[in-house]
Amino acid sequence: MKNKKALFIPLFIIILFIAFFNKIINFIINIKWFKEVNYLAVYFTKMRAIIILMIPIFIIFFISIWMYYKSLIINKNKSVVDIGLNKNNYGKKLFFIFNFIVSIFLAYIFSSSYWYRILQFNNSVDFNVKDPIFFKDVSFYIFKLPLFESLYKVIISLLLFLVITTFIAYFILEAKYKIQSRKDINLKNINHGIKSFAGKQLAIVSGLIILFISFGHLIKIWNLVYSSNGVSFGASYTDVHATLLFYKIIVVITLISSIVTLLSIVKGKFKPVSVCIGITIFLIVSQNIASFLVQNFIVKSNEKTLEQPYIKNNIDLTRKAFALDDIEIRDFDIKNDLQKQDIADNKASIDNVRINSFKPTLEFYNQVQIIRYYYTFNDIDIDRYNINGKYNQVFLAAREIDTDALNPNTWQNRHLIYTHGFGAVMNKVNSVTSEGQPDFVIKDIPPYNKTNIKLTNPRIYFGEKTNDYVIVNTKINEFDYPREDSNKTNKYNGHAGIKMSFINRLLFAINKKDINFLLSKDIKKDSKIIINRNIVERAKKIAPFLTYDSDPYMVIYNGKIYWIIDAYTTTNRYPYSEPYDSINYIRNSAKVVIDSVDGDTNFYITDKKDPIVNNYAKIFKGLFKEEKDAPKEIREHFRYPKDLFSIQSKVLGKYHVKDPGVFYNGEDLWEVSKDQKHVEGETNTNDAPYIIMKLPDQNKEEMVLLNYFNVMKKDNMIALFGARMDGEQYGKKILYKLPSDKTVYSPYLFKQKINQDTNISKELSLWNREGSKVQYGDTIILPIKNSLLYIEPLYLRASGKNSIPEMKRVILSYNDKLVLSSSIQEGIKEIFNSKDNKINDKNEKDSTKTIDDSKLKKAQEYYNKAIEAQKNGDWTKYGENINELGNILNSIK
């Protein structure tokens, strides 16, 4: 027997090891990786918290269950107990093992589920904003109430578990006793049997359940700030004057009932227990009836008056939660009285107007600049740089390796040779080539650079498409970039990666389920494996509690490529705040900066006033750095994130209204303007553009994220909403309210104006023929002083799989003038230099008459040949024909 016991423990350990083998391997690798990225302390925060919590929770569970068990066997008058439990010590030993396993399991489940809430509770940071009903700081609802709710659910679940296990134990033991004594089971005696077996225990548990029902209704009282019963989110008139009153009564009555129940047990009386349970149920039902009566017979007919104070609470706290309470609001009285001097004063704004559009530019990048089939550009980023002494807005993108496109896609190619992307492409947003394509200032491999921006190490080991591991410093040279006659190779000189010792090779072979780690002769002791290379997944791995922006963007600094990811703190627990997309509070509290070569990942706090990020900083010591610790050149490229701006714009459409009466009527709702990408295409929500502009009353251009608002379900533009981001102005928001008594063209209405212009629509019809298609670019509405200048790039796309859209014309509109021009500068001249600010149609017609018909035919011939070459993907012939076309057009001038 002793030998069997001696074998049991090691056998049990072996079984556990096999069951958790993969998790153990993952755990070891995680330790190595977090140590490599210098965030091991962050990783151990969770583990340390779970272990520290498990010990006292295990003791509480174990003692509670053991005492309950002892109370069941203490009565030796019942034979069922004598036979089932107290005959010998075997039952006690068996229950001890059962209790140990159950207690440690429950302790682990509780600790791993609620460690974070407990740490949030202990590290709570005040918001210095109180809710208007209970006058508690908002921090109570975000950091403390969730823990109270969790404790309530766990304790109620445990008490119900005890009740259920008591009944199960009774039925098992009763059945065993009847079988052993050869007596029939009599269901009529169950009630008496239960009382004799565990009457007092069940009564105590019932008393505790009633006590925690009292606590549960106290939680319900606090949760009224999240009520959705009224006309606005948060506690309504009915909630405050009916539901709250009944909840308070239930809290008091159930508290008294729990005491009465426990006293009744001491006196051996069970009837008061039933009465207390009955009263509790009656009050809960009565609360629902009372709330229904108040809502339908008092509130419904006087709703606007009675709900106004609660609507105001909702407005004020929703605006605070989404950071809309600090918007600078100005009236924008459209005068359309611009003079030539105004244009000259805003030359930098006009020179930076974006005539390149995102989708066509990305298509062009992926057709012309990928160089080889295994490269790709994931997306286009927009930013501002001082290029050769001038402030410019630019498009830029990183050239990454698409490992899925490799051919052959072997293990060596995928993980040892094609380890990194190479280089970046940049073009100014305000200019195109004579063919209507982006005018590059950085392009090709190795980089051809016309700027003062240094890019000496353009390798991309960490990016948006780097979804697989690589092994560097192997016996095989890494592919660096292609050359005409051969490939340039490279040896990794960064410090990222985990050394590939034999033990580590074995660990990764198991983890990746790949024997190549052990069989490969190319891997040396000095080789390193780089994992978690996708920049967003890398940030999530380190700080999974943050929410990350959908659009990371690249920055060129210190000769290398860096990535910036906007990180958000969010919650759905902000009192009285209307939820949008499952959250009712958001702050862009941190920026994550990642080195594309070394993988260094730094989290910088950019909003010190946010209590949630400060709470995280207290919990995860060593994770965050101050914003000032980021290099100045990196900080200059921090952008106001579009994801945040999009949510704020959605909220602002309803919550720009501060008057509760107007809010109740719903008479002043806005929506983000619609737009149209094709001449006869469907409409969709306009994508907010980043614009270089000089705000009214400012003397310097800056980058602003701008959204256009319409009246709900109307196309008339009613407001401009902007977020600033340069220098000390970062994060400041401004709302320009447009006159409501005038027709102000929204992007969609502007498109309709274009379609209705006979001269322009005729041109579009000619272009939009069979074989080619006209496509709108990104609409820009540029405020200049008290006027609006509309800019719309026009693209022409030939039919065919490999066709590339070309920016052919720009439509400009100012006041009632609409011109179709070859460039913004030409369009501006046409609008502001023509006599009496009118377009001289006669001169245009006269100039047209002087053009030689033979040249026109020749131009048409070269154009058709170019389109045909484009369809066939023959870019050499395409370029030749376009050059010939350009020569003819120049001769016509």
UniProtKB/Swiss-Prot annotation:
GO cellular component, one term: extracellular region
Transmembrane segments: 9-29, 49-69, 94-114, 154-174, 202-222, 246-266, 273-293
Membrane topology summary: Multi-pass membrane protein
Chief location category: membrane
Keyword Lyase found: no
Alphabetically ordered keywords of this record: Cell membrane, Membrane, Transmembrane, Transmembrane helix
Subcellular location: Cell membrane
Family the UniProt entry places it in: Belongs to the UPF0182 family.
Protein name per the record: UPF0182 protein CLM_0018
Organism: Clostridium botulinum (strain Kyoto / Type A2)
